[in-house]
Amino acid sequence: AISGLTPCKESKQFAKREKQ
């Protein structure tokens, strides 16, 4: 997924969504 394009805050929320 794109984890470098998203900011730090978004990255955290994104990782949470990816984990689920």
From Swiss-Prot:
Homology family: Belongs to the PsaF family.
Q: Where is the composition biased (Basic and acidic residues)?
A: 9-20
Which locations, inside or outside the cell, does it occupy?
Plastid, Chloroplast thylakoid lumen
First and last residue of the signal peptide: none
Official protein name in the record: Photosystem I reaction center subunit III
Q: Does the keyword Cell inner membrane apply?
A: no
Q: Where is this region: Disordered?
A: 1-20
Any one of the GO CC terms: photosystem I
Please tell me the species this chain comes from: Pisum sativum (Garden pea)
Q: Give an example GO biological process.
A: photosynthesis
Name of the encoding gene? PSAF
